[in-house]
UniProtKB/Swiss-Prot annotation:
<protein>
    <recommendedName>
        <fullName>Co-chaperone protein HscB homolog</fullName>
    </recommendedName>
</protein>
<dbReference type="GO" id="GO:0044571">
    <property type="term" value="P:[2Fe-2S] cluster assembly"/>
</dbReference>
<dbReference type="InterPro" id="IPR001623">
    <property type="entry name" value="DnaJ_domain"/>
</dbReference>
<feature type="domain" description="J">
    <location>
        <begin position="2"/>
        <end position="74"/>
    </location>
</feature>
<comment type="similarity">
    <text>Belongs to the HscB family.</text>
</comment>
<comment type="function">
    <text>Co-chaperone involved in the maturation of iron-sulfur cluster-containing proteins. Seems to help targeting proteins to be folded toward HscA.</text>
</comment>
<dbReference type="GO" id="GO:0051259">
    <property type="term" value="P:protein complex oligomerization"/>
</dbReference>
<comment type="subunit">
    <text>Interacts with HscA and stimulates its ATPase activity.</text>
</comment>
<dbReference type="GO" id="GO:0051087">
    <property type="term" value="F:protein-folding chaperone binding"/>
</dbReference>
<dbReference type="InterPro" id="IPR004640">
    <property type="entry name" value="HscB"/>
</dbReference>
<dbReference type="Pfam" id="PF00226">
    <property type="entry name" value="DnaJ"/>
</dbReference>
<dbReference type="InterPro" id="IPR009073">
    <property type="entry name" value="HscB_oligo_C"/>
</dbReference>
<dbReference type="GO" id="GO:1990230">
    <property type="term" value="C:iron-sulfur cluster transfer complex"/>
</dbReference>
<dbReference type="GO" id="GO:0001671">
    <property type="term" value="F:ATPase activator activity"/>
</dbReference>
<dbReference type="GO" id="GO:0006457">
    <property type="term" value="P:protein folding"/>
</dbReference>
<dbReference type="InterPro" id="IPR036386">
    <property type="entry name" value="HscB_C_sf"/>
</dbReference>
<keyword id="KW-0143">Chaperone</keyword>
């Protein structure tokens, strides 16, 4: 049983987040180890394992990048943990330029405003790549989707770096 089947969801990238959450809460209640306190040792162990499986599956499906990686793996394209280098020099150059731009924000005349504008630009880029991943996965374009997920991971890391700069500026 795959993660989508576990939650009774269609096996596709686009999913209903509120339905995922409600199914998660329902499964958590049903397989909570306390419900098996008087059961046999074997049944208690199975309940603990099922609860762990439910939690793991929820974490994977809840986040778009891990959900895309999971769908790719389910379709024979494993990219988790791989050390494949990015093959798109234009994208890598753009990422380097964006990181330089982020570094320069602290020295700008209005760093808060500059950071807001920069964050908006990066968020737009993230959403565009996410929409492309969805299309590529829906069309079964596994290699293209895998490449796009690699790019999304770069952008997500940049978004985290933006949050760190924001914390420094506001803190």
């Amino acid at each position: 049983m795959n993660h989508f089947e576990l939650f009774g969801l269609p096996s596709q990238f686009q999913l209903d987040g509120s339905l995922l959450s409600s199914q998660f809460r329902e499964l958590q209640k049903r397989f909570h180890p306390d419900n098996f306190a008087t059961a046999s040792e074997r049944d208690r162990l199975m309940a603990v394992q099922k609860a762990a499986q439910i939690n793991d599956a929820y974490q994977v499906l809840k986040h778009p990048i891990s959900r895309a990686e999971y769908i790719l793996a389910e379709n024979g394209t494993e990219i988790r943990g791989e050390q494949q280098t990015m093959q798109d020099p234009m994208f890598l150059m753009e990422q380097m330029e964006l990181r330089e731009e982020l570094e320069d924000i602290a020295d700008s005349s209005d760093p808060e405003s500059a950071l807001f504008d920069f964050d908006s630009k990066v968020s737009k880029m993230y959403k565009q790549h996410l929409a492309s991943v969805e299309q590529e996965l829906d069309q079964g374009l596994w290699a293209e989707a895998a490449d796009r997920v690699r790019k999304l991971k770069f952008i997500a890391k940049l978004k985290n770096e933006i949050e760190l700069v924001e914390d420094k500026l506001l803190g």
